[in-house]
Swiss-Prot record:
InterPro entries: Conotoxin. This is Kappa-conotoxin RIIIK. It comes from Conus radiatus. Disulfide bonds join C54-C67, C55-C72, C62-C73. The modification 4-hydroxyproline is found at P52, P63, P65, P71. GO terms for cellular component: extracellular region. The modification Threonine amide is found at T74. The keyword Membrane does not apply. The keyword Disulfide bond applies.
């Protein structure tokens, strides 16, 4: 029985239980935490700010005249 205890102790020292991924360490959970942090381009300057695409907007509401000449928006 002592040989089994020594073997178990050696195995736990070589491969501790903390090496196993826990539920809180899953990538999906990390994504939810990042979304709750409210990281946005207004707070972080290294995110580039882009204007919305004219093709995704209603042309009558688009303030940019170049959007009305854009071939992808004429459909």
């Amino acid at each position: 029985m002592s040989k089994l205890g020594v073997l178990l102790t050696i195995c736990l020292l070589l491969f501790p239980l903390t090496a196993l991924p826990m539920d809180g360490d899953q990538p999906v959970d990390r994504l939810a935490e990042r979304m709750q942090d409210n990281i946005s381009s207004e707070q972080h300057t290294f995110f580039e700010k882009r204007l919305p695409s004219c093709c995704s907007l209603n042309l009558r509401l688009c303030p940019v005249p170049a959007c009305k000449r854009n071939p992808c928006c004429t459909g």
